[in-house]
Amino acid sequence: MAPIKKRNQQNQPNINERIRFPKIRVVDADGTQLGIMAPSEAMEIADERNLDLVLVSDKADPPVCRVMDYGKFKFEQEKKAREAKKKQHTSDVKEVKMRYKIQTHDYEVRVNHAKRFLKSGDKVKATVTFRGREIQHSHLAEALLKKMANDLLDFAEIQQAPKREGRNMIMYLSPKK
């Protein structure tokens, strides 16, 4: 039979009876200082008010504890974490592919796609693909990518200049700050 694992005490916050310090500084829910006292006295104050005693900072001397409703405090922290996660935007790399013999309208469509990606905060990888002997005309592809960078000057800055990788020529653009 496998041994029963105890719940890890480190993951649980120091509240009420779990506070193990000889003296603590106690702060009220509204921020007023109640003074330095033993944890048992602070627990009595918290019990009178039907609140919890929560360890705020164990680095201070003496450690700081606050009398508050722990359930409400935990809910507020989780809510703040959710809001921060919503606002966080991961920057993806979006690719715009074309050939060096691209027509004007098709080129404009690619530029508009790149603009849209850059406005949404994503990086853009502009790729010009070669087929067969087209690779001999890599200077035309480089000129096309430089033209694209010039057209997107208001929205982007070149992160990596046009460079050949195998049968492709690639340029990276990142949104302007």
UniProtKB/Swiss-Prot annotation:
<dbReference type="InterPro" id="IPR001288">
    <property type="entry name" value="Translation_initiation_fac_3"/>
</dbReference>
<protein>
    <recommendedName>
        <fullName>Translation initiation factor IF-3</fullName>
    </recommendedName>
</protein>
<dbReference type="GO" id="GO:0005829">
    <property type="term" value="C:cytosol"/>
</dbReference>
<dbReference type="GO" id="GO:0032790">
    <property type="term" value="P:ribosome disassembly"/>
</dbReference>
<dbReference type="Pfam" id="PF00707">
    <property type="entry name" value="IF3_C"/>
</dbReference>
<dbReference type="GO" id="GO:0043022">
    <property type="term" value="F:ribosome binding"/>
</dbReference>
<keyword id="KW-0396">Initiation factor</keyword>
<dbReference type="Pfam" id="PF05198">
    <property type="entry name" value="IF3_N"/>
</dbReference>
<keyword id="KW-0648">Protein biosynthesis</keyword>
<dbReference type="InterPro" id="IPR036788">
    <property type="entry name" value="T_IF-3_C_sf"/>
</dbReference>
<comment type="function">
    <text>IF-3 binds to the 30S ribosomal subunit and shifts the equilibrium between 70S ribosomes and their 50S and 30S subunits in favor of the free subunits, thus enhancing the availability of 30S subunits on which protein synthesis initiation begins.</text>
</comment>
<dbReference type="GO" id="GO:0003743">
    <property type="term" value="F:translation initiation factor activity"/>
</dbReference>
<dbReference type="InterPro" id="IPR019814">
    <property type="entry name" value="Translation_initiation_fac_3_N"/>
</dbReference>
<dbReference type="InterPro" id="IPR036787">
    <property type="entry name" value="T_IF-3_N_sf"/>
</dbReference>
<comment type="subunit">
    <text>Monomer.</text>
</comment>
<dbReference type="InterPro" id="IPR019815">
    <property type="entry name" value="Translation_initiation_fac_3_C"/>
</dbReference>
<keyword id="KW-0963">Cytoplasm</keyword>
<dbReference type="InterPro" id="IPR019813">
    <property type="entry name" value="Translation_initiation_fac3_CS"/>
</dbReference>
<comment type="similarity">
    <text>Belongs to the IF-3 family.</text>
</comment>
<dbReference type="GO" id="GO:0016020">
    <property type="term" value="C:membrane"/>
</dbReference>
